[in-house]
Amino acid sequence: MNNVLLHRITEKGNIRYYSIEIIATLFEEYMVERVYGNVRFKSCTGIKNNVFPSFNEAQIFFEKLKKQKMKKGYA
């Protein structure tokens, strides 16, 4: 489906990542999954999921998140 991997380097030199993906579920819904963290750690800092009844709604949310993260310095 749709996915994007964003990253940024903080002032302290930490590399942060933020992955956003749209996934079709078995129930004809769409889930936007966000995985984020610091590359220095073995596992991610967090995972968040949002479920939408249509692809269009999921796409709008996906683009909104992407725009917000890019404003915060992720590329």
Regions found by a protein language model. Give the residues of each.
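Short aromatic-glycine-(Arg/Gly/Cys) micro-motifs in beta-strand/loop hairpins
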Residues: 20-48, 63
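Short acidic/glycine-enriched loop/turn segments that link adjacent beta-strands
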Residues: 13-14, 28
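Helix-centric, low-specificity signal for extended rod-like, repetitive segments
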Residues: 1, 9, 27, 59-62
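Negatively charged, low-complexity tracts enriched in Asp/Glu with abundant Ser/Thr
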Residues: 1-13, 43, 53
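A short, charged, amphipathic alpha-helix used as a generic interaction element across diverse proteins
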Residues: 41-44, 53-70
